[in-house]
Amino acid sequence: MRSLPSAVTVAIIGAGPVGLMSANLLGQLGIDVLLIERNAAPYDIPRAITLDDEGARTLQAVGLDREYLPLTLPSRGSRYYDDAGKLFAEVGPGPTEFGFPRRTQIFQP
């Protein structure tokens, strides 16, 4: 294990999507960042199912939109059921505004 620096401007705990993106954005601004993750490798089980238009714009800000967005599918909406099988929420696909679909689905085999 590498030794940790004695001082950094920003420490981020957790290398999930938010931690990774935050470290990326701060690094592009020239800010020294320490990203700490307890797991040695990413989870191999799919967990995220959608990306919204704000997430797409964030990917665009770091130059990843053209690489990532072709891997998504336009959302047709979602229905959410409780453990008894009762529908408790329904979300439509939403309009495409500001250059990106409101929601896209992430294909995870």
Predicted regions and their residues:
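Active-site-adjacent segment of FAD-dependent monooxygenases/related oxidoreductases
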Residues: 47, 51-109
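Glycine-rich FAD pyrophosphate-binding loop
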Residues: 13, 24-47
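Beta1/beta-strand and adjacent pyrophosphate-binding region of the FAD-binding site
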Residues: 2-18
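A short alpha-helix capping/helix-coil boundary motif
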Residues: 2-3, 33-37, 93-96
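A generic fold-level signal
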Residues: 5, 43, 72-73
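Short alpha-helical segment within the catalytic ATP-binding CA
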Residues: 20-21, 53
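Short, cationic motifs built from Arg/Lys/His that form the positively charged side of catalytic pockets
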Residues: 19, 38, 108-109
